[in-house]
Amino acid sequence: MAMQDTLHALADPTRREILNLLKQSRMSAGDIVKNFSVSGAAISRHLSVLKEAGLIRDEREGKFIYYELNTTVLEGIMLSLIHI
């Protein structure tokens, strides 16, 4: 994923808050939605942007999808920024 796409995903405060939540533990989409005052559809879109940027990954368990941080991408971004 291009750094530009990743930085675009990080630019949104709601997406950064989702990453903060996922820093603590993996969560289902429903659990993530409970922490915000926006619609489930809006959170779903934010999750899609984060996933496309490689910042999170998902895993289906039965009828639920759980999201977790992809720390490898975050570490790569930090290293790239240090060397600018």
Predicted regions and their residues:
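Conserved small/polar residues in nucleotide/adenosyl-binding loops
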Residues: 82-84
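Residues in the helix-turn-helix
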Residues: 42
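Active-site phosphate/pyrophosphate-handling residues
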Residues: 17, 47-48
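Alpha-helical residues within the helix-turn-helix
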Residues: 34, 45, 51-52
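N-terminal helix-turn-helix DNA-binding core of bacterial DNA-binding proteins
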Residues: 2-39, 61-73
